[in-house]
Amino acid sequence: MAASTTCPARSMASVSRALRPRPHAAIASAAVRTAARLGGGLGIVCSMPSYGRKEKEEWGLTIASAPATTAAPALRSCQLLCKAEANISSNLPESIPSEANQYEKIVELLTTLFPVWVILGTIIGIYKPSMVTWLETDLFTVGLGFLMLSMGLTLTFEDFRRCMRNPWTVGVGFLAQYLIKPMLGFAIAMTLKLSAPLATGLILVSCCPGGQASNVATYISKGNVALSVLMTTCSTIGAIVMTPLLTKLLAGQLVPVDAAGLAISTFQVVLLPTIVGVLAHEYFPKFTERIISITPLIGVLLTTLLCASPIGQVSEVLKAQGGQLIIPVALLHVAAFALGYWLSKVSSFGESTSRTISIECGMQSSALGFLLAQKHFTNPLVAVPSAVSVVCMALGGSALAVFWRNRGLPANDKDDFKE
């Protein structure tokens, strides 16, 4: 198998599987679990076929004999990842089906084009809403739960241990997600004097956990992908308490907020599927590998629908008040990106970590916000900011990631991540 020069998801998969038998494998395995989930909210998981123990041990010995610097910064440099794959490519089993490689290329192409699918979904949602509005609350809940399950399938107990080894770095990201972002949502809603339903919707979406699209944007921007995974995981788990609590505190004065109902729904849709996925990966790894192999394309389609459906369901409102609604939501995301980056620099983090925290702060699970708004608020306008946020988040995050990618990283960039 020739080494790739475009560093596709299979490159990360090759590196991760080669490193996994070695003591310092966690960082590479985090990369494959994230980069293979490329795309929007996404729960999209690519996987390499399972190989025998002998081949894995041979790969591990191959990497162990290579210079330590080959793998250490792998998460932050596509070039080094590609180089690492070149180093181990001669040791890969020749029996890898070409169809599997082609499948992974197709999945990567589809997932990295996520912003394009969001734009198409937005157009369809506005002008042909009947094509996507069939995905109503119950089906929407199942779809979002499936994506959270697929994210859980890529996590292990070791990921949570790494959170404990990086309390300050992960903690700053958590602070940005659940302090800066909600306060921004509240301040913008009050400053622009939004109506009570729209203000509540803006506050609700600002209190949602990080979205998996942030992992993709971090990868593109040359940020710390492993750190992005950890912060998304932590904010997802914390959502069961933080999302209903902050929404109640900040929006309770505007409309009645059922904090208990929000907590229960968040647990059912976000936390429970994630826990099931983690346990399945930990105790039934072979079974999990088989599931992961068939989820990518399903995830691409499902994620596009979960982005298009909210737009379709509020299309009439968007046609009538589109400009008025876009401004506060876009301002929320832009300010969150900027303040997340500033907070990281104030905390003396390196450029890679600062980009990661900025993206994590600016991109959240808008689909969860839309679902909670539909289930727990009687006024349909509460769901509108979350629908608009789907588009603003995807386009804004992608644009920022491409901008940073073209700027590169300082040669002496500080590494704030501890294995």
Swiss-Prot record:
GO CC term (a single one): membrane
GO MF, one example: symporter activity
What InterPro entries does UniProt report for this protein, alphabetically?
BilAc:Na_symport/Acr3 (IPR002657), Bilac:Na_transpt (IPR004710), Na+/solute_symporter_sf (IPR038770)
- Targeting signal (transit peptide) range: 1-45
Keywords in alphabetical order: Chloroplast, Membrane, Plastid, Symport, Transit peptide, Transmembrane, Transmembrane helix, Transport
Q: Where are the transmembrane segments?
A: 106-126, 137-157, 170-190, 194-214, 225-245, 259-279, 291-311, 323-343, 384-404
Q: Which domain of life is it from?
A: Eukaryota
Where in or outside the cell it occurs: the entry states:
Membrane; Plastid, Chloroplast envelope
What turns on this gene? By ethylene, gibberellin and submergence.
Keyword Transit peptide listed: yes
User: How does this protein sit in the membrane?
Assistant: Multi-pass membrane protein
Asked whether the keyword Transmembrane helix is assigned, the reply is yes
Q: Which coarse location class describes where this protein primarily resides?
A: membrane
Q: Can you tell me which family this protein belongs to? A: Belongs to the bile acid:sodium symporter (BASS) (TC 2.A.28) family.
Biological role: May function as sodium-coupled metabolite transporter across the chloroplast envelope.
Protein name, please? Answer: Probable sodium/metabolite cotransporter BASS2, chloroplastic
Look up and give the organism this protein is from: Oryza sativa subsp. japonica
